[in-house]
Amino acid sequence: MSQSKDTRRSNRPGWDEYFMQVADVVSRRSTCIRRNVGAVIVKDKRILATGYNGAPSGLAHCADVGCLREELGIPSGERHEICRGLHAEQNAIIQAAKYGIAIEGSTIYCTVEPCSLCTKMLINSKIVRIVYKEPYPDDLARRLLAESKVTVEHFVVPDIN
């Protein structure tokens, strides 16, 4: 027996949920051994670019050669400069730039709240809205965003029951 039209509609994800699900799938491409992060840049309900965290294109993956930050016991959020990987947000911005896609005025969906490095890039890229799922404790990023005109929203996965 088929579902009624009303039942099918109630299971249909809203746009924020849909794009966050896409970001979740993108995060599965990550090659970082510490955290899998995905990002999707969207404008007018159209995906412009995606990115996940990992080593630069053509270089050995962290999963293959190890993580210096892990070996040195460096906590998450510290000493980004010795990480061989790029963040998901950085890769999404780079992909858009590489293919000549304007991202000004767009929204970025991130599986993890952006760090201060990515936040500065997102502000300068003129992204107007950041939607993230998992909080990330970076006070500088939050202060920068509070000072900017960027809208920030914590996405909470809807309860389907």
Task: Report the location of each language-model feature.
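Zinc-dependent deaminase catalytic domain
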Residues: 1-161
